[in-house]
């Protein structure tokens, strides 16, 4: 068995609730990401051998917690190579996703991948989130290692509509690596919930990574 096939078997053990159709689409996405990453640095090239079990697994941990109703609207800020936005759009076809980045070449790549994956529930926008109108448009705003928690919170807090028909309630879902306590202490932000991803999937060896939910 080759290393790639072994990685997918491991992922299926970690996320057994995902359908075969979803896995096939996720495989197509990683193939496209590798294709583009050889031309444009979207993901650290030293991580490409562990793309599935490190970066994709990190994003897929959201599926352990996120239960959303049809037509939910989600914004992925600083999407880079489409993480976590594209995997989430694949896993939640009933929802509407906006993937946003300020760097033109990354937006071009993500647009290409969305088109080739035929993700009709996904739009891609170039720009900075703080320049968006102050409209409470989205049920959730997603981010992964974009900036510090206080800065991200200030950027997106006025973009989230109040509501509790989803689980968790509407708000910010931020994938954070490293210690977060000092950032929360100095900013006086109070998350609704913090999940340790290493405790959730110790076999994944994700390290000191967390999913932090702010209810708005």
PLM feature spans:
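Short "lid" loop at the C-terminus of a central beta-strand within the Rossmann-like core
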Residues: 130, 148, 176-181
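Active-site capping/gating segments
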Residues: 177-216
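Class I S-adenosylmethionine-dependent transferase superfamily signal
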Residues: 88, 156-163
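A short, conserved alpha-helix within the catalytic core of class I
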Residues: 148-158
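Class I SAM-dependent transferase core
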Residues: 1-70, 75, 105, 111-122
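Conserved beta-strand signature within the Rossmann-like core of class I S-adenosyl-L-methionine
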Residues: 164-179
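Conserved SAM/SAH cofactor-binding pocket of Class I
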Residues: 60-143, 153
């Amino acid at each position: 068995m080759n290393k790639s096939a072994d990685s997918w078997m491991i992922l299926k053990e970690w996320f057994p609730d995902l359908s075969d159709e979803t896995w096939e689409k996720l495989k197509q996405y990683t193939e496209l990401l590798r294709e583009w990453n050889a031309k444009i640095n979207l993901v650290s090239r030293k991580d490409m051998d562990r793309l599935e079990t490190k970066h994709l697994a990190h994003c897929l941990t959201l599926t352990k917690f996120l239960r959303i109703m049809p037509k939910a609207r989600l914004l992925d800020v600083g999407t880079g190579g489409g993480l976590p936005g594209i995997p989430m759009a694949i896993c939640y076809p009933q929802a509407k996703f906006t993937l946003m980045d300020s760097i033109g070449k990354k937006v071009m790549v993500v647009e290409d991948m969305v088109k080739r994956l035929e993700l009709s529930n996904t739009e891609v926008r170039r720009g900075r989130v703080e320049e968006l109108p102050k409209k409470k448009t989205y049920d959730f705003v997603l981010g992964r290692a974009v900036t510090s928690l206080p800065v991200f919170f200030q950027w997106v807090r006025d973009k989230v509509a109040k509501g509790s028909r989803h689980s968790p309630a509407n708000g910010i879902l931020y994938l954070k690596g490293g210690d977060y306590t000092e950032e929360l202490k100095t900013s006086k932000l109070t998350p609704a919930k913090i999940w340790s991803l290493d405790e959730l999937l110790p076999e994944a060896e994700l390290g000191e990574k967390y999913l932090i939910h702010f209810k708005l």
